[in-house]
Amino acid sequence: MGLRFKKVLNMNIAKIMIPKICTVVLHERSTIRQGLEVLAHCHYTAIPVLDAEEHYVGSVTEGDFLRHIIKTGTTDMKEQEKYSVRDILRRDFCPALSIEAEFDVVVDASLRQNFVPVVDSRNALCGIVTRRSLIAEIAASKK
């Protein structure tokens, strides 16, 4: 194993994470309509969800929104304003890792999740690690 790659394995998550300020998030009080609009605009398949204190509480996916639309039986956006993201939130989907987590733990999580939410000791979202950011860092270490 090359010296540069060993450095990647010892890397701090903060170096490869996309900071919260650059991350698309929803708040659990956002309406389903707002969530659908964000998904349509950003073309993501899953988005982290925060509470009022900016703590990470889970993630929602396109499928969560589709299941909700089927359950309510309407695609009327005015009607979807009656429901909040909290109603469809999956708290166990995309579990977060601590900013202190080891690099190999991040790699393992990225094999199961499209993105890995990164939180501080208060469970406040610091940012996310995507598969793309992870691969880019590994590729850069090979140069």
PLM regions: where:
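A short, polar/charged loop-to-alpha-helix boundary motif
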Residues: 64-80, 134-143
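Short, low-complexity N-terminal regulatory "tails/caps" that precede and couple sensory modules
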Residues: 1-8
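Bateman (tandem CBS) regulatory domains
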Residues: 10-23, 81-93
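The conserved cystathionine-beta-synthase
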Residues: 25-43, 50, 95-113, 119-122, ...
